[in-house]
Amino acid sequence: MTNTKYKRIVLKVSGEALAGEQGFGINPEIVKVVANEIKSVHDLGVQIAIVCGGGNIWRGVTGEQMGMERAQADYMGMMATVMNALALQDNLESIGVPTRVQTSIEMRQIAEPYIRRKAVRHLEKGRVVIFAGGTGNPYFSTDTTAALRAAEIDADVILMAKNNVDGVYSADPNTDPSAVKFDTLTHLDIINKGLQVMDSTASTLSMDNDIPLVVFNLNEADNIKKVVEGANIGTTIEGEE
């Protein structure tokens, strides 16, 4: 392994990032680019776990707004994350990266069930592991899944790969010209200031387990690799003080 800052990472890839500018569904070209970015990090010997969102296909809160029972709508969202995971797995394996998908809801014909010890073993053997299906429970986001899985597999960091967002700002930079980008924050800052990085459950879980986060722009070439190697890009969130 080369000298990287992080040895085992959880990469959170939002569904929106896989949709690209089309805004819905899976953009094949975007998935190819993301897969190649992941391969460049895998080639460094870094152990990579990925959590896929599903917002490019379905969101539980959308279903609830339509009058659906929230739990039912959330389960649909979990299925969406599996579709994204399978697309990413296919692209990674096509470029020579051994990849396993583990789902929190069993569907053995297409993926392994989530087993923590097996996931860690895959990582130790140099395989990428994609966690799909969220936590397997309604009312929990895929951000919370990322925090939970990072704690379970003892990851060094959670990389929050955003779609055309290069860090955390004091306000929306697209609408507020006075918005200031933060280079560093604490988990408590995120919670107390209500900054839109991840939901409060995920933030609290990350803080309680002392897991740092790096929020960065997925759309800039080599950014995942740069973060892993310790480059000062995006916003780093860690600690309580």
Curated annotation (Swiss-Prot):
Allosterically activated by GTP. Inhibited by UTP. Its EC number is 2.7.4.22. Residues 20-25 are annotated as: Involved in allosteric activation by GTP. UMP binds at residues 54, 74, 135-142. The keyword Kinase applies. Pathway: Pyrimidine metabolism; CTP biosynthesis via de novo pathway; UDP from UMP (UMPK route): step 1/1. Homohexamer. PANTHER family: URIDYLATE KINASE, URIDYLATE KINASE PUMPKIN, CHLOROPLASTIC. GO terms for biological process: 'de novo' CTP biosynthetic process; UDP biosynthetic process. It comes from Latilactobacillus sakei subsp. sakei (strain 23K). Catalyzes the reversible phosphorylation of UMP to UDP. It comes from the Bacteria. GO terms for cellular component: cytoplasm. Pfam families: AA_kinase (PF00696). It is found in: Cytoplasm. ATP binds at residues 12-15, 55, 59, 163, 169, 172. This is Uridylate kinase. Belongs to the UMP kinase family. It catalyses: UMP + ATP = UDP + ADP.
